[in-house]
Curated annotation (Swiss-Prot):
GO biological process: response to host immune response
Family indicated by similarity: Belongs to the mycobacterial PPE family.
Organism: Mycobacterium tuberculosis (strain CDC 1551 / Oshkosh)
The protein, known as: Uncharacterized PPE family protein PPE30
Gene that encodes the chain: PPE30
SUPFAM superfamilies, A to Z: PE/PPE dimer-like
């Protein structure tokens, strides 16, 4: 810009119209502070790198130092440039101050112009010509002074504004690192998913073949853990023994339970502490068993003619009718099945279990009475069927072989399941007896109802 063509009003007005040197001084202080901070940071970085490279050596340490060193150098260089910029700003502020001081103040220029106007207005006769020339001369000096100040300021400011350009910081990371990291992450995720699928497949395959490969897996594990090549063989042998013993647990348990139950019942039934005493049988209980006989007799007496044959004269052994001497030879205590097969309907409620034995004295009295009552019921069977009852046929005498008979009865008591039962009528009785004489064992013959009721020999033994 050609400041010489501009009047002092403009040049002086511009210099006085601006903010002054304050902003330039503030910029210089800011640049100076930035330079100080950059220099301190660079020193800290350099110290840290020196410490790391001293205690950490290797390729990674060298790579780190190589990546950080350019950045430290850049910070140091930038600090120097910032300090230079601060100095330039300070120089620019100084140039402004010098130009401002050299510039004619605008009020002085305005006063000169006002004086010139007055002189020119009062110069009627030419008397103000010298004063006017002097005022013009002072104005010209003002013009030259402002032009010189502006030219000097322009030169100084142009030098002060010439600052070395700043460089961008060097990269400390690989620009392709993000892309490479993304590719690596994708590959890792894919590999992890593949490994998970493979692991699931292996687990499922192992579970599917766990039953078949159990021995092989356990054998390998035993050999690997113990270090003994024959450990698996010992393990399999012990496992086989364990399985064999476990298979015998249930049968042995059932056998022991059955045996113990039988022993307990035997002890309760054949309790030697409280033997059976027929004298202790209550008369009321005996009457309860005989009640059925009296009821039947009373009922028959009102609706039927008198019975022409003797009844209830035979004894009872279990469910069989025998001679009276047989019943006397029978032991006092009998099996539960034999006792209850001869009881009547009224004897069952009277049989109560008492402390000390399976059947108390009262219960035995009840079933004994039922046996007698049962004889009455069997004696009237022929009459109720519409026929008549004749005299009982005695094929065996009371005095026939009492010892042998006792032995047969005792055998029946010990093994009631060995008795073979046969059912026939009067017409087939002789043939059945003839056939049974050829068969060994103990036989019980049961007579079916007919024209007459006959108690046949129900026990036979051969061999």
């Amino acid at each position: 810009m050609d400041f010489g063509v501009l009047p002092p009003e403009i040049n002086s007005g511009r210099m006085y119209a601006g903010p002054g040197s304050g902003p330039m001084l503030a910029a210089a202080a800011a640049w100076d502070g930035l330079a100080t901070e950059l220099q301190s940071t660079a020193a800290d970085y350099g110290s840290v790198i020196s410490v790391l490279t001293g205690v950490w050596s290797g390729q990674s340490s060298g790579t780190m130092a190589a990546a950080a060193a350019p950045y430290v150098a850049w910070m140091s260089a930038t600090a120097a440039l910032a300090r230079e910029a601060a100095a330039q700003a300070s120089a620019a502020a100084a140039a402004y101050e010098a130009a401002f001081a050299a510039t004619v103040p605008p009020p002085v220029v305005a006063a000169n112009r006002a004086e010139l106007a007055v002189l020119a207005a009062t110069n009627i006769f030419g008397q103000n010509t010298g004063a006017i020339a002097a005022a013009e001369a002072r104005y010209a000096e003002m013009w030259a002074q402002d032009a010189a100040a502006m030219y000097g300021y322009a030169g100084s400011s142009s030098v002060a504004t010439q600052v070395t350009p700043f460089a961008a910081p060097p990269p400390t990371t690989n620009a392709a690192g993000l892309a490479t990291q993304g590719v690596a992450v994708a590959q890792a995720v894919g590999a992890s998913a593949g490994n998970a699928r493979s692991l699931v497949s292996e687990v499922l395959e192992f579970l599917a073949t766990a039953g078949t490969n159990y021995n092989k897996t356990v054998a390998s594990l035993m050999n690997a853990v113990t270090g003994v090549p024959y450990a698996s063989s010992v393990y399999n042998s012990m496992l086989g023994l364990g399985f064999a013993e476990s298979k015998m647990v249930l049968p042995a348990n059932d056998t022991v339970i059955s045996t113990i139950f039988g022993m307990v019942q035997f002890q309760k039934f054949f309790n030697p502490v409280t033997p059976f005493n027929p004298d202790l049988i209550p008369k009321s209980a005996l009457g309860a068993g005989l009640g059925l006989r009296s009821a039947i007799s009373s009922g028959l007496g009102s609706t039927a003619p008198a019975i022409s044959a003797g009844a209830s004269q035979a004894g009872s052994v279990g469910g069989m009718s025998v001679p009276p001497s047989w019943a006397a030879a029978t032991p006092a205590i009998r099996t539960v099945a034999a006792v209850f097969s001869s009881t009547g309907l009224q004897a069952v409620p009277a049989a109560a279990i008492s402390e000390g034995s399976l059947l108390s004295q009262m219960a035995l009295a009840s079933v004994a009475g039922g046996a007698l009552g049962g004889a009455a019921a069997r004696a009237t069977g022929g009459f109720l069927g519409g026929g008549r009852v004749t005299a009982v046929k005695k094929s065996l005498k009371d005095s026939d072989l009492p010892d042998k008979l006792r032995r047969v009865v005792a055998h029946m008591m010990e093994k009631p399941e060995s008795v073979q039962h046969w059912h026939t009528d009067e017409d087939g009785l002789d043939d059945l007896l003839a056939e049974l004489k050829k068969k060994p064992g103990i036989h019980a013959v049961h007579m079916a109802g007919g024209n007459k009721a006959e108690i046949a020999p129900t026990i036979s033994e051969s061999g």
